């Protein structure tokens, strides 16, 4: 098609071009204008010629007009830059509303007039169609969409995206030595899809490791490790070198922590028996310092004294450590049992896609890069890594050992005596009686806990080791704790057989018990059954001793599947927990904590109400999830029966149906039982009613002095767990 125009400098001189790009550029620059209707007739062009030109330039997709609010200018933007301009620089598409507003400006500036001139040449409806096509294409070209499927996606885990981005394919192809080119075309990158898919960890491996963790009754241990257990375990291992006896300094006086060592041994056994990987894979780790690696030469072996948390997704860490750290790349072997454990199915941070390698693992250094060598790598992939170490897995000390042989042994160490405490005896301790309520916690910790911040109590038929630990719940850890506090103190105890936390008490004016379990699971062995009189008594006495007024006991959370379920159903059902307290009440009327001094913080009648509430008053065909279809096929007519059905058959949708309960309870959190399944134990009333005490202080006496917790926390006091990566992420 020929594009006829007249130069602005010679409006009666008709010229033409065959190139639409030249034509659009000149129109945009204001150096030419459309021919008028008389000139069209003179050239004997069709009546719709000018409109055809408008449509053609509006459908022209190589360059399109975008509006920049910062400068109030319309710019002609190349298609490859459309997505970055809109996403990163806040440029915007132009539509009829924008054009109308522009025309209606009462006192337009010269810029406004020029914008109006540019847009007068376009058919805005056609232009919008072009925008949509370009935006999608630009999105793809700018490395945000491909059709290359992740082999891990078919595990059904919700945090895994189905497709690689082009940036990921580009990075992995280069990093895995599939190409030596730093810059690849879209078609070249896509050609690496099958090769990259073969190297990545498949769904089969993730599912094997998931069911292995479940069958080992280790969900609670993995949850604990991923939250704060890894900090305490690795701090102990690195400090004492207890898994590498040959590196222990003879001059060191090591005070043993047998409780923590037991958790470490259980975790090592769990990894040692983990299924092997179907293929060789690459995992990554970012660290802040390489002091422990600097001495290595190519070919040297490094043996780690602690667990190593790695990721199969370099982009997770790459994006979050973009300010510059040290990258470690490790190649792990295929078909060797006990190499490492994929924990993402049960991790509290599944997006980390974490693979844990055990202590004593040996790594051979095969490559090292820093400074200038990394410059191209950094510029292309946006990694501001100071150094890059590449290792290959060699082995670990546990692979050929039997489980009973995995024991930590530290020669010439000190094993502190257990501090047995009968809390009931302390009720008559004059030192406690004469202390203010706010000073009791410090006195108890200083007087009755060991050097490891532990004390031991006999409750019922079991002996429990309790730990004082500290936390900061103001950042990434906020969801896992009831109290939002910089210097929080908690008391925990774990199952000696499985290593999981079976009670977690957040200390304060109220002791909050097991709030964390909504993100974990209640101890499956029922070693701790709080719904027993001996625990109600112990919690009440403990509140008295440390100066807390009440105890709030939160719901148990469990998971289940039927023996008749298929493997796929078991894999799905063992990922989702639910409130055991709600389920058992709705299922068969079971109530927890029916003690005089314990009051539920919800109304059971509100749960009964569900059995009279029609499902289709809540679940609608316009809902975006699967609930409507499943509700139709379930045959359930009321919300109570439907909730039970979802738990037993489709636990993936538990959170969805619980969100729907807002409709049932008119969006009133105060009456919605799903918002607060907990029970309030009036601890001091319990002691008063059972004649342990003869006086209950006034409420104003149950206060915590500002800074009193902080004084108890420190490296030589109650140790606070840290995770620098997650802390950094929350600060950004």
Curated annotation (Swiss-Prot):
InterPro entries: ADP-ribosyltransferase (IPR003540)
Recorded GO CC terms: extracellular region
Domain TR mART core: 163-390
Active site: 285, 309, 354
Highest taxon in the source lineage: Viruses
Entries under SUPFAM superfamilies matching the protein: ADP-ribosylation (SSF56399)
Pfam families assigned to the protein according to its UniProt record, in alphabetical order: ADPrib_exo_Tox
Record protein name field: Uncharacterized protein R217
Taxonomic lineage: Viruses, Varidnaviria, Bamfordvirae, Nucleocytoviricota, Megaviricetes
